[in-house]
């Protein structure tokens, strides 16, 4: 027989505080019965010697000391099945696409099991996104966690959808799936995501979770865990390679801050809770490859930097946990370049283990290094030209300046539905590097020049 407790002593924002009468588990699900006969769901957020704090999913409007609380003894579980593929769900796992509820193979705790560090395998397989600035210079590797640092008004949603449509492990016939979770988005954005997935056919191999801006903040904290649980199930139970795309982590962190303020916690940097680093790590660290298991979980987390400030706590802490970052540039966006990814501050720390002969191509590393060096020099020269003018530059410097423009216009720029193979990306790279004198290609070995340089191929 279930017991109902009427010991509510305080209601604060999305939280209720109860006097503790018997042991309660952390994260335990709760049913709240209102005096008018309606019910709400909640979860135990904190428990002490004499008090229990419950976060209410549907908001606390209408709750008072007459409301009854029933503890279920269970944590939040996601019903999982391979039938999730092709479905659009709410942030709480409820169908949004008009389809039936998913008949589960099992119900899995959304907090997941921690991954034993010894059982992790080093990521080393290339994932092709079809976007040259990622594949060519900041390569994504299977099992990696790589965030995209963007800003308000920049096309990070379009980049996320393009990756969701195009991502694949080239040359592999192993099943590949995408789990897409959007947090705190508007109804307009949700419709845009749903339409794009359905029109392009990407939905067939995807599971989509959408948490709207007017949904409870508590649900925003649950959404990425739902997505990662679905990804782990597909990867570790069905041997699929799963790419998880989470957008927008900033909205998730704002929900954390809101919950912390409601609990009257002592705030950390800029009002965010002091445990935000640990909390973000509990999401990011669920990516990886495990010994003896064919499947893998790779993670793209998109976050908008408030005020384009890369030192803001959210991108700052994310950078410590993740394995690099892709930086979306407002300057390139103003020039009308899509995708406006600035490769210079971008970095993929695992790139070297996922490229080269047998993975991408033997010249990949050398070409990437040479383009970085030449583009960085060309960008520096733009600042010099603004002061002394083009006429003061040497012939060599003019070539570098032209290379920077070519790099942005031909390598960075591509259309929203252009899916470039790694061979396409490297071919374009060689075509623009060929505009520089060979003597300036100091980072490329002669054997690669002989094999791939367009001038050498013509002479043959």
UniProtKB/Swiss-Prot annotation:
Q: Name one GO molecular function term.
A: proton-transporting ATP synthase activity, rotational mechanism
Protein name per Swiss-Prot or TrEMBL: A-type ATP synthase subunit B
Protein family membership: Belongs to the ATPase alpha/beta chains family.
How does this protein sit in the membrane? Peripheral membrane protein
Give the matching HAMAP family.
Answer: ATP_synth_B_arch
Q: Which InterPro entries match?
A: ATP-synt_VA_C, ATPase_a/bsu_AS, ATPase_A1-cplx_bsu, ATPase_F1/V1/A1_a/bsu_N, ATPase_F1/V1/A1_a/bsu_nucl-bd, P-loop_NTPase, V-ATPase_su_B/beta
Identify the CDD domains for this entry: ATP-synt_V_A-type_beta_C, ATP-synt_V_A-type_beta_N, V_A-ATPase_B
Q: Which source organism does the UniProt entry give? A: Methanococcoides burtonii (strain DSM 6242 / NBRC 107633 / OCM 468 / ACE-M)
Domain of life, source organism: Archaea
- Does this UniProt record's set of keywords contain Cell membrane? yes
Name the gene. atpB
- Which BP terms does GO give this entry? proton motive force-driven plasma membrane ATP synthesis
What does the UniProt function comment say about this protein?
Component of the A-type ATP synthase that produces ATP from ADP in the presence of a proton gradient across the membrane. The B chain is a regulatory subunit.
Subunit-level organization: Has multiple subunits with at least A(3), B(3), C, D, E, F, H, I and proteolipid K(x).
Any one of the GO CC terms: proton-transporting two-sector ATPase complex, catalytic domain
């Amino acid at each position: 027989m279930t017991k109902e407790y009427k010991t509510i002593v305080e209601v604060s924002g999305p939280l209720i505080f109860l006097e503790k009468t018997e042991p309660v588990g952390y994260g335990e699900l709760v049913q709240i019965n209102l005096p008018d006969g309606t019910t709400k769901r909640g979860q135990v957020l904190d428990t002490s010697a004499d008090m229990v704090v419950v976060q209410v999913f549907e908001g606390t409007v209408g709750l008072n000391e007459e409301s009854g609380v029933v503890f279920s003894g269970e944590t939040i579980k996601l019903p999982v099945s391979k039938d999730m593929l092709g479905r659009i769900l709410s942030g709480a796992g409820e169908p949004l696409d008009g389809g039936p509820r998913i008949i589960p193979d099992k119900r899995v705790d959304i907090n997941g099991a921690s991954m034993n560090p010894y059982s992790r395998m080093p990521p080393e397989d290339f994932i092709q996104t079809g976007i040259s600035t990622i594949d060519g210079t900041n390569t994504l590797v299977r099992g990696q966690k790589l965030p995209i640092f963007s800003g308000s008004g920049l096309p990070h949603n379009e980049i996320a959808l393009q990756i969701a449509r195009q991502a694949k492990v080239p040359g592999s016939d192993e099943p590949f799936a995408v789990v897409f979770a959007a947090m705190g988005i508007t109804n307009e954005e949700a419709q845009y995501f749903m339409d794009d997935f359905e029109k392009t056919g990407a939905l067939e191999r995807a599971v989509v979770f959408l948490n709207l801006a007017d949904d409870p903040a508590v649900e925003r904290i649950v959404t990425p865990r739902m997505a990662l649980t679905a990804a782990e199930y597909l990867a570790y139970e069905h041997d699929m390679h799963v790419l998880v795309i989470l957008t927008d982590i900033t909205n998730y962190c704002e929900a954390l801050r809101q919950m912390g303020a409601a609990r009257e916690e002592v705030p950390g940097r800029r009002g965010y809770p002091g445990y935000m680093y640990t909390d973000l790590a509990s999401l990011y660290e669920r990516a990886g490859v495990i010994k003896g298991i064919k499947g893998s979980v790779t993670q793209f987390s998109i976050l908008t930097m408030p005020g384009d400030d890369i030192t803001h706590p959210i991108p700052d802490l994310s950078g410590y946990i993740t394995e690099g970052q892709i930086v979306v540039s407002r300057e390139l966006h103003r020039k009308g370049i899509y995708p406006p990814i600035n490769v210079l501050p971008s970095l993929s720390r695992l790139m070297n283990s996922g490229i080269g002969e047998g993975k991408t191509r033997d010249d990949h590393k050398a070409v990437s290094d040479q383009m970085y060096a030449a583009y960085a020099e060309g960008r520096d020269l733009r600042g010099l030209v603004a002061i002394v003018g083009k006429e003061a530059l040497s012939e060599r410097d003019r070539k570098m300046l032209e290379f920077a423009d070519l790099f942005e216009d031909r390598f960075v720029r591509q259309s929203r539905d252009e899916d470039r193979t790694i061979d396409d990306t490297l071919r374009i790279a060689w075509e623009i590097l060929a505009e520089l004198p060979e003597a300036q290609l100091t980072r490329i070995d002669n054997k690669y020049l002989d094999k791939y340089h367009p001038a050498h191929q013509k002479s043959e």
